[in-house]
């Protein structure tokens, strides 16, 4: 509810919050000060009334008879000490007035005799007067007591409180107005680094993503935001570079088979040919069509796998048994290449069976393309407490260090100059990485050139 009432802009919102907090603080302070002053005035009036009442009791103790009370009017007036807000009256036990100062106003209803030794007090509703009454013993005579009533006129106190309240309200209103102006200026000053950051961000373009925003004279949260923004620009630049390379590689990989198809068709149509010759051209074109088809299927798979995590059919698999099954598919090709495939170790993985097969299949296919004749491809299954690791190793040429970080990128090839379009689509390892990300796992490669290259898949023990 409060968020909906606040302005939408950060500058206006900061200004409004500062004004509201200041107004609330001033209001609470004003109420507290007003209450303190009121309590102080009430305490002072109560003290003066009590002191006057005590003095009157002392002097009445020297009076022999109530008939002597009017004769000592000067003494009773002296007990007020010239206090203009105090008045008093003395009654006998029958309630007859024996003495009263000029400003005394009898309370309505009249104060009854105290039932205890505590003086009775009263403050009639709507009046500015307050009263304090008590019985005082006389020295002798009949009756032996008189009733003293002390009156306090709080008119001046009320006027002081009204003036104080008015002054406080005026000061607080002026303070809120001044605070509003200062808050707006503070918000403008505080957000100036943010405006400079926005102005520089507006100058950014796709060709300048590699240039981070210059360091601003900021600290704290704005410095963190500046670093986060520059980090985002770096990631965007890397994404644009990968996208540009992807587009370039895609165009190159599709151009080669299309160029071959076009050249074969043009040669076939350059002169009349026999049916067998046309058949040879068509059969030759099938390989290129199949390569294009595989490339399109791999690209569609990658596009679908980006949002496929929630659709995985996760179950516990015997990693070694499944690896034996996948390796069996490649036995004929391994025999032709004079390469053997060996599965070792035991492990259990939590994975989608079809995707596990595809990831392992891509790694075995990649190893077959690089393993020398007479060598062995080793599939190792290892179980740990927090993960299961499946690795595929071969003894081919290996991968130099600069290429290992990018080997799983789409269409990335270690040696583009030696790339043969018939050898694959260039998406196999990218598919492996996508499958592992969907399983919450990781993949990587360790290579010692001309000695051993190992691609590994690490599945977490509790995959989603």
UniProtKB/Swiss-Prot annotation:
Q: Which residues cross the membrane?
A: 14-34, 168-188
Function text? Member of the two-component regulatory system IrlR/IrlS. May be involved in invasion of eukaryotic cells and heavy-metal resistance. Probably activates IrlR by phosphorylation.
Q: What is the lineage of its organism?
A: Bacteria, Pseudomonadati, Pseudomonadota, Betaproteobacteria, Burkholderiales
- Residues that bear Phosphohistidine: 252
EC code: 2.7.13.3
Boundaries of each Histidine kinase domain copy?
A: 249-463
Q: Where in the cell is it found?
A: Cell inner membrane
Protein name, UniProt field: Sensor protein IrlS
Pfam families from the entry? HAMP, HATPase_c, HisKA
């Amino acid at each position: 509810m409060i968020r909906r009432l606040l302005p939408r802009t950060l500058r206006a919102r900061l200004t409004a919050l500062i004004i509201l907090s200041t107004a609330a603080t001033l209001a609470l302070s004003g109420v507290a000060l007003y209450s303190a002053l009121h309590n102080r005035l009430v305490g002072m009036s109560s003290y003066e009334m009590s002191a006057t009442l005590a003095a009157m009791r002392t002097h009445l103790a020297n009076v022999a008879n109530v008939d002597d009370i009017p004769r000592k009017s000067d003494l009773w007036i002296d007990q007020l000490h010239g206090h203009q807000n105090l008045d008093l009256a003395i009654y006998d036990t029958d309630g007859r007035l024996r003495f009263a100062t000029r400003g005394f106003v009898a309370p309505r209803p009249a104060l009854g005799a105290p039932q205890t030794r505590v003086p009775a007090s009263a403050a009639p509703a709507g009046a500015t007067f307050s009263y304090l009454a008590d019985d005082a013993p006389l020295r002798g005579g009949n009756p032996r007591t008189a009733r003293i009533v002390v009156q306090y006129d709080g008119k001046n106190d009320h006027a002081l409180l009204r003036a104080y309240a008015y002054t406080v309200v005026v000061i607080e209103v002026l303070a809120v107005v001044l605070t509003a102006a200062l808050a707006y200026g503070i918000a403008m000053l505080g957000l100036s680094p943010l405006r400079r950051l926005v102005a520089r961000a507006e100058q950014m373009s796709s060709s300048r993503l590699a240039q981070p925003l210059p360091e601003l004279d900021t600290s704290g949260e704005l410095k963190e935001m500046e670093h986060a923004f520059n980090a985002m620009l770096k990631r965007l630049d890397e994404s644009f570079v990968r996208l540009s390379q992807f587009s370039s590689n895609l165009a190159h990989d599709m151009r080669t088979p299309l160029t071959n198809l076009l050249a074969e068709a043009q040669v076939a149509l350059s002169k009349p040919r026999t049916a067998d010759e046309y058949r040879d051209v068509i059969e030759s074109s099938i390989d290129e069509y199949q390569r294009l088809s595989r490339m399109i299927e791999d690209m569609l798979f990658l596009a679908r796998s980006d949002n496929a995590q929630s659709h995985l059919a996760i179950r516990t698999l015997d990693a070694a048994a499944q690896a034996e099954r996948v390796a069996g598919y490649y036995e004929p090709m391994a025999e032709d290449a004079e390469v053997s495939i060996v599965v070792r170790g035991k492990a259990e993985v939590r994975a989608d069976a079809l995707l596990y097969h595809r990831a392992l299949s891509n790694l075995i296919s990649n190893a077959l393309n690089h393993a020398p004749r007479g060598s062995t491809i080793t599939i190792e299954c290892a179980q740990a407490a927090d993960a299961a690791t499946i690795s595929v190793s071969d003894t081919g040429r290996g991968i130099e260090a600069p290429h290992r970080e990018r080997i799983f990128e789409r269409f990335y090839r270690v040696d583009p100059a030696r790339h043969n379009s018939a050898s694959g689509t260039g998406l196999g390892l990218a598919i492996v990485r996508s499958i592992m990300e969907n399983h919450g796992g990781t993949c990587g490669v360790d290579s010692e050139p001309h000695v051993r290259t190992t691609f590994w898949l690490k599945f977490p023990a509790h995959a989603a």
